Amino acid sequence: MSRVVSALMGLVLMFGCAFFSVQPQAQALDLSNGFVSAAVLGERVNPADKVLESEYGKKIDLNNASVRLFRELRGFYPTLAKRIIENAPYDSVEDVLNIPDLSEKQLARLEENLERFTVTPPADVFIDGDQRLNTGDY
């Protein structure tokens, strides 16, 4: 009985290998009917570009900036920058002065640099995935 089963399995295996190993031939698309549909290519839009054209590209946005953007300001990176990001969103630039438990030195640094900040509504393109503290730029 086992020889019959072995022989049968061998035949099935040989037939399967022979049948499934044949590669189908590629056939050209028939375009003789004159109707060709093509995708309409639109202009690529990066959602960040619109925001960067605004004041965000010139000043540090308190609601959308990553911690690394604060490196250009002396005394902000990383501690004060992290506190600013953790207490966002802000309705106005002056709201950053209301962060709890700021030292006098930190408060003075914020007041000195208020003109370098802006506030825009939080944009998913910049804060999606909670990547404001570690953007992965190394």
From Swiss-Prot:
Signal peptide (UniProt feature, chain positions): 1-28
Domain of life: Bacteria
Primary role: One of the extrinsic, lumenal subunits of photosystem II (PSII). PSII is a light-driven water plastoquinone oxidoreductase, using light energy to abstract electrons from H(2)O, generating a proton gradient subsequently used for ATP formation. The extrinsic proteins stabilize the structure of photosystem II oxygen-evolving complex (OEC), the ion environment of oxygen evolution and protect the OEC against heat-induced inactivation.
Entry GO terms, CC: extrinsic component of membrane; photosystem II oxygen evolving complex; plasma membrane-derived thylakoid membrane
Gene3D superfamilies documented for this protein: Photosystem II 12 kDa extrinsic protein
Protein name: Photosystem II extrinsic protein U
NCBIfam families associated with the record: PRK02515.1 (NF002708)
Main location: membrane
Quaternary structure and partners: PSII is composed of 1 copy each of membrane proteins PsbA, PsbB, PsbC, PsbD, PsbE, PsbF, PsbH, PsbI, PsbJ, PsbK, PsbL, PsbM, PsbT, PsbX, PsbY, PsbZ, Psb30/Ycf12, peripheral proteins PsbO, CyanoQ (PsbQ), PsbU, PsbV and a large number of cofactors. It forms dimeric complexes.
Organism of derivation: Picosynechococcus sp. (strain ATCC 27264 / PCC 7002 / PR-6)
Membrane topology: Peripheral membrane protein
UniProt family annotation: Belongs to the PsbU family.
Pfam families according to UniProt: PsbU
GO biological process terms, semicolon-separated: photosynthesis; photosystem II stabilization
